Amino acid sequence: MNEEKKALVELMLGGSEAAFDELYRSSSKKLYRMAYFITGNRSDSEDILQETFVKCFLYRDKLREPERFEPWLYQILVRTAWRVEKRKKSRSELSFEGILDQEKDHLRAEWIQEDEREKGPLGAVLEAETAAQIRDALSKLDMKYRTVILLYYYNELSTKEIAGVTGTMEGTVKSRLFKARKLLKGILEAEDIVEGEKERGICHG
């Protein structure tokens, strides 16, 4: 967090509505996208966004460290989104249509690279895949796996921060990331978006 944003957070914590409004303007777009990727519903995402910021202001005294503002805000949003999704559990599939084309830059293969941020087996997505195809693949993941992928690769939170956001142990987050990457890789390979090991001529044993 830069010093300017930290100063705004400190002012907001002191009750400044002007600072709160500025934080809303600077953060709402990214938070809305996050809510949309979790729910796949624009109306729900707008409601989740509004509820997140209402809670942010009402419970601002619970934020002890200004530099922790973003993970704290994601915690509110993710848990609110999960609650909404649990209420609508009967819905069988999510639609991810209609996100702005500019999302493509945010949805590249770096989401699904290895922990060390080196180019992993899904690196071909960077050149070969579109945002829409990746969104479709993500929509097929269970919500808990989709969420950790988004928080880690898209929002660039650490596994420790994600643990705080999701209310789980850091080891659980790492396990979910590993499984999510494996599942996502399988989906992309099954749809011929990236090559599997057999197609690349790789064999084991």
Residue locations for each model-derived region?
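Short helix-capping/turn signature of helix-turn-helix
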Residues: 26-29, 37-38, 141, 150-157
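A short, charge-rich alpha-helical start-of-domain segment used by transcription regulators
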Residues: 9-33, 37
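Amphipathic alpha-helical segment used for protein-protein interaction
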Residues: 5, 10, 14-17, 89, ...
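Arg/Lys-rich amphipathic alpha helix in sigma70-family domain 2
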Residues: 58-65, 78-96, 104-105, 127, ...
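C-terminal edge and immediately downstream basic/flexible tail or linker adjoining helix-turn-helix-like DNA-binding
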Residues: 1-2, 7-11, 93-97, 133, ...
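DNA-recognition helix of helix-turn-helix
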Residues: 78-82, 134, 145, 154, ...
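Conserved RNAP core-binding helix
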Residues: 24-25, 32, 42-59
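Structural recognition of an alpha-helix C-terminal capping motif at a helix-to-coil junction
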Residues: 33, 47-54, 67-79
